[in-house]
């Protein structure tokens, strides 16, 4: 474990923030730097079949050290950090033996407070790695990368029995492109785990069904003084549309297994307005109902408009709930839960109120639930990770490999 923290600090020093709306994959040059570094490290460790695709997917194999027909399994993390917050010049703070209370982030006004983040009350005595209040930390998902790399080293150094272990590091997960160019056949694993979760013990195999809704509103602009019966204000139509969306089904009003409608952006003038929503729901029928609801709202608001004025709505599915694919292979979850218990961790099965590469990979034929990393408050200045949690994640990865080798 001695190199776990060193690896993590090394990885977060590289700015790998991804960028939405970019055609190329990876979307940023910084991701290539980390991918090339990891490729070099994997080769130095003696892994075989180390490949880096033109779309930035890095794969490698730790060969089995025991004979027999042991299923090849995989571990996957992503190299990019969220576009929501800067990942440049990350300056981590290490708080040893946390004793409670506020933690000053750098020399500014930002603090990490248990008043806002009550989970801190449960972390007394542990080592926290925080930001300096100016950037995100990058534990999502460089904690996962450091944990996988350290687990590979532990498996090698301690000669722990295992089958073929496949690892992959992907780009652009945060902008929804991480799995689109993933070659499942080349990866050649029976199943895999993304290491991209949160607090210790989290095991996730359910995620949102997700869709995006883009609404284009075309109005008619004339001088306000002579507008009666002629002007069609696109902004007013946009306001009417949003007023029809259930206010109590927004992200800030929902939790657990509850779905939502989220107005992510809105811009415009009298003549033209654009709205972007995302729709999320765990239940497939409710998911489809939410999409129908948006179409009904657009029809209702657009009824009776002049032919030159219109509301155009485009709905595009993003990903689906991987639960239906993972539950077909219950041993995948059984092994992960047993591994956690063997490491004195009580598994906490909870839904992902978001998505992971694993969701898309599960529908591409690679069942892929999500393991914890020990990180919290992703995508912002209050992000932090627990060193002891990272160490536990390494132990669980190693134990999963060991338990799989026993399932001959």
Curated annotation (Swiss-Prot):
One of its GO terms (biological process) is proteolysis. The keyword Cell membrane does not apply. Zn(2+) 2 binds at residues 140, 174, 379. It is found in: Cytoplasm. Zn(2+) 1 binds at residues 78, 140, 196. It comes from the Bacteria. Its EC number is 3.4.11.4. It is an enzyme of class 3 (hydrolase). InterPro entries: ArgE/DapE_CS, Bact_exopeptidase_dim_dom, Peptidase_M20, Peptidase_M20_dimer, Peptidase_M20B. Belongs to the peptidase M20B family. Cleaves the N-terminal amino acid of tripeptides. HAMAP family: Aminopeptidase_M20 (MF_00550). This is Peptidase T. It comes from Shigella flexneri.
């Amino acid at each position: 474990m001695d190199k776990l923290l060193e690896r993590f600090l090394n990885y977060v020093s590289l700015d790998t923030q991804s960028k939405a709306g970019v055609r190329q994959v990876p979307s940023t040059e910084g991701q290539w730097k980390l991918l090339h570094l990891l490729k070099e490290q994997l080769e130095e460790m003696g892994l075989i079949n180390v490949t880096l695709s033109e779309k930035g997917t890095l794969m490698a194999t730790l060969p089995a050290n025991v004979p027999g027909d042991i299923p090849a399994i995989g571990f996957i993390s992503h190299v990019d950090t969220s576009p929501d917050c800067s990942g440049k010049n990350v300056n981590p703070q290490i708080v040893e033996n946390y004793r409670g209370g506020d933690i000053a982030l750098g020399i500014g006004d930002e603090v990490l407070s248990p008043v806002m983040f009550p989970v801190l009350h449960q972390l007394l005595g542990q080592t926290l790695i925080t930001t300096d209040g100016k950037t995100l930390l990058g534990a999502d998902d460089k904690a996962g990368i450091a944990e996988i790399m350290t687990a590979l080293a532990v498996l090698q150094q301690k000669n722990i029995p295992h089958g073929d272990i496949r690892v992959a590091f992907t780009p652009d997960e945060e902008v929804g492109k991480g799995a689109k160019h993933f070659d499942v056949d080349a990866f050649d694993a029976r199943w895999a785990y993304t290491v991209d979760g949160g607090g210790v013990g989290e095991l996730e195999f359910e995620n949102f069904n997700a869709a995006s809704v883009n609404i284009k509103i075309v109005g008619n602009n004339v001088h306000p003084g002579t507008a009666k019966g002629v002007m069609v204000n696109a902004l007013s139509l946009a306001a009417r549309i949003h007023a029809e969306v259930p206010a109590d089904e927004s992200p800030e009003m929902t939790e657990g297994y509850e779905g939502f409608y989220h107005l992510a952006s809105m811009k415009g003038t009298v003549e033209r307005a654009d709205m972007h929503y995302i729709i999320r729901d765990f239940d497939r029928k409710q998911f489809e109902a939410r999409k129908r609801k948006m179409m009904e709202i657009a029809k209702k608001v657009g009824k009776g408009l002049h032919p030159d004025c219109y509301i155009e709505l485009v709905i595009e599915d993003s990903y689906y709930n991987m639960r239906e694919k993972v539950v077909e292979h219950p041993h995948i979850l059984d092994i992960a839960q047993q591994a956690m218990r063997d490491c004195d961790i009580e598994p906490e099965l909870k839904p992902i109120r978001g998505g992971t590469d694993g969701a898309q990979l599960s529908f591409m034929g690679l069942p892929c639930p999500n393991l914890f990393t020990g990180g919290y408050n992703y995508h912002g200045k209050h992000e932090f990770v627990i060193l002891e949690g990272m160490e536990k994640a390494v132990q669980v990865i190693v134990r999963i490999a060991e338990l799989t080798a026993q399932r001959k």
